[in-house]
Swiss-Prot record:
Region annotation Lipid-binding: where it falls in the sequence: 68-99
Family: Belongs to the apolipoprotein C3 family.
Top-level taxonomic group: Eukaryota
Biological source species: Homo sapiens
Name of this protein: Apolipoprotein C-III
């Protein structure tokens, strides 16, 4: 073989090797980017789940406090007006007797 042909073949082999290395680097880079996107999404999902749980606990507390206040208010109203509701069976309003 002529030296020029050998030189061209060697340069082509070197160029092909460099391209293959770039393809591997690009594929590794895209793999790592995909992995980081997945890890970021997982972390965000976990954080939002914890925050939703805390919000749900706070909302349950508010609802419980609201029902407790309503129950206390109803008890107070019931006690104040119980004298009107508890009529003595012996004391009945008199009705006019027609003669």
């Amino acid at each position: 073989m002529q030296p020029r042909v050998l030189l061209v073949v060697a340069l082509l082999a070197l160029l092909a090797s460099a391209r293959a290395s770039e393809a591997e680097d690009a594929s590794l880079l895209s793999f790592m980017q995909g992995y980081m996107k997945h890890a970021t999404k997982t972390a965000k999902d976990a954080l939002s789940s914890v925050q939703e749980s805390q919000v749900a606990q706070q909302a349950r507390g508010w609802v419980t406090d609201g029902f407790s206040s309503l129950k206390d208010y109803w008890s107070t109203v019931k006690d104040k007006f119980s004298e009107f509701w508890d009529l003595d069976p012996e004391v009945r309003p008199t009705s006019a007797v027609a003669a």
